[in-house]
């Protein structure tokens, strides 16, 4: 169980590092955020089943629902940005430009 937790924490850390490294492109950032949410989902589900805390067994499902909503909003933003500007650079998302 300890090696599984370590692998999931490493996956989360690598996805977080990916967000920090590839923050100029929106698509890369969205993929790294999805990796973070997936590793959190698996880690939460494993910890709940390991410690027999079935009173909070709906928490991973709620996290998965919020992750799907985040992915939908992110993809809508990606489509809108790429159709307006022709690329997925995050610099185009400055709302103070006129």
UniProtKB/Swiss-Prot annotation:
It catalyses: a ubiquinone + NADH + 5 H(+)(in) = a ubiquinol + NAD(+) + 4 H(+)(out). Pfam families: Oxidored_q2 (PF00420). Belongs to the complex I subunit 4L family. Its EC number is 7.1.1.2. Core subunit of respiratory chain NADH dehydrogenase (Complex I) which is composed of 45 different subunits. InterPro entries: NADH_UbQ_OxRdtase_chain4L/K, NUOK/Mnh_C1-like. Keywords: Electron transport, Membrane, Mitochondrion, Mitochondrion inner membrane, NAD, Respiratory chain, Translocase, Transmembrane, Transmembrane helix, Transport, Ubiquinone. It is an enzyme of class 7 (translocase). GO terms for biological process: ATP synthesis coupled electron transport. GO terms for cellular component: mitochondrial inner membrane; respiratory chain complex I. Gene3D superfamilies: 1.10.287.3510. It is a multi-pass membrane protein. This is NADH-ubiquinone oxidoreductase chain 4L. PANTHER family: NADH-UBIQUINONE OXIDOREDUCTASE CHAIN 4L, NADH-UBIQUINONE OXIDOREDUCTASE SUBUNIT ND4L. It comes from Pseudocheirus peregrinus. Its main location: mitochondrion. The chain crosses the membrane at residues 1-21, 28-48, 59-79. Core subunit of the mitochondrial membrane respiratory chain NADH dehydrogenase (Complex I) which catalyzes electron transfer from NADH through the respiratory chain, using ubiquinone as an electron acceptor. Part of the enzyme membrane arm which is embedded in the lipid bilayer and involved in proton translocation. One of its GO terms (molecular function) is NADH dehydrogenase (ubiquinone) activity. It is found in: Mitochondrion inner membrane.
């Amino acid at each position: 169980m300890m090696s599984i937790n370590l692998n999931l924490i490493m996956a989360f850390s690598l996805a977080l590092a990916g967000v920090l490294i590839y923050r100029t492109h929106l698509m890369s950032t969205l993929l790294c955020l999805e990796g973070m949410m997936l590793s959190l989902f698996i880690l939460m589900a494993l910890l709940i089943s390991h410690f027999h805390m079935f009173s909070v067994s709906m928490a991973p499902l709620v996290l998965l629902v919020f992750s799907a909503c985040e992915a939908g909003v992110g993809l809508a933003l990606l489509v809108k940005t790429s159709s307006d500007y022709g690329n997925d650079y995050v610099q185009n998302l400055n709302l103070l430009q006129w």
